[in-house]
């Protein structure tokens, strides 16, 4: 049996005191922008109307930028350009490092892969701002501790 120690960054064996360092899985989460609009999606099993930035795991041997391109194309059939790192966030469920990116879409024609996500839609900056100002349709009221919340907040304030 092991117990967490050092704030959860390692586990120590109760019987032999050996240290184990849990794996951290890198994940890209990206705001896809086009003509002052942002693309948001609803994941499998999420409540109706719950929208967030698209995201996906980075595959072994893949760069962050390659993962952004692949995940975006897999989920919504859009090619992207100019992927830029914004900031990151550790996510403990299950041991992920969320890597926040912003990128531009080549076009706005969606080809949604329903094996990956339930739906995706383009939203204007005014629509997103209204949600954050508590005056609009609450399609994405994301908890303030999430990286998606901060990516969107950055975008509407830019």
Q: Which residues fall in each region the model found?
A:
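Histidine/lysine/aspartate-rich catalytic loop segments that bind and position anionic ligands
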Residues: 26-37, 42-54
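Hydrophobic alpha-helical positions that pack around
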Residues: 54, 68, 72
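Active-site-adjacent beta-strand/loop module that shapes the phosphate/pyrophosphate-binding cleft
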Residues: 89-112
